[in-house]
Amino acid sequence: MADITDIKTILYTEKSLNLQEQGVVVIQTSPKMTKNGLKEVLREYFGVTPVRINSLKMDGKIKRFRGREGQRNSFKKFYVKLPEGVSLESSEA
């Protein structure tokens, strides 16, 4: 089962801020999160039922440091369409 700890952050980029005007929130999560898991977390912790969820898998970039290769962490990005007039504010605040 998915947990709130699997959500890393809500992304605030130029693209995501433009999408917020249309009621879409961009959420970065761990790679094991699923659409149904995210829907459960949003219902349980935020009291919001999303209209639509699109997911995107982002592989970690390969970076070099002092001659050695390493890889940044992979993550999933979700585009969550919320009902009109609803925002993500924690019900446990």
UniProtKB/Swiss-Prot annotation:
Gene3D superfamilies: 3.30.70.330. GO terms for cellular component: ribonucleoprotein complex; ribosome. Keywords: Ribonucleoprotein, Ribosomal protein, RNA-binding, rRNA-binding. One of its GO terms (molecular function) is structural constituent of ribosome. InterPro entries: Nucleotide-bd_a/b_plait_sf (IPR012677), Ribosomal_uL23-like (IPR013025), Ribosomal_uL23/eL15/eS24_sf (IPR012678). It comes from the Bacteria. GO terms for biological process: translation. The keyword Nucleotide-binding does not apply. One of the early assembly proteins it binds 23S rRNA. One of the proteins that surrounds the polypeptide exit tunnel on the outside of the ribosome. Forms the main docking site for trigger factor binding to the ribosome. Part of the 50S ribosomal subunit. Contacts protein L29, and trigger factor when it is bound to the ribosome. Belongs to the universal ribosomal protein uL23 family. This is Large ribosomal subunit protein uL23. The lineage of its organism: Bacteria, Pseudomonadati, Campylobacterota, Epsilonproteobacteria, Campylobacterales.
